[in-house]
């Protein structure tokens, strides 16, 4: 199954709306740990998801969040 890195970006003013968007959206990403920089003023969130397509990967996010998110296909890589 392909893996995608979802990178979401928002402003400080949008931060609350981004997290609130998940309350009314059934997503397997809810209540799961991920990496975010909001606490430090960066206002970016990253998720790694397994999905058949980029569209399927973005479909795991509420529309409001997905519209501000890029999906990049990735794979584990060992750095020599």
Q: Which residues make up each language-model segment?
A:
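Conserved, structured core segments of small domains
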Residues: 1-80
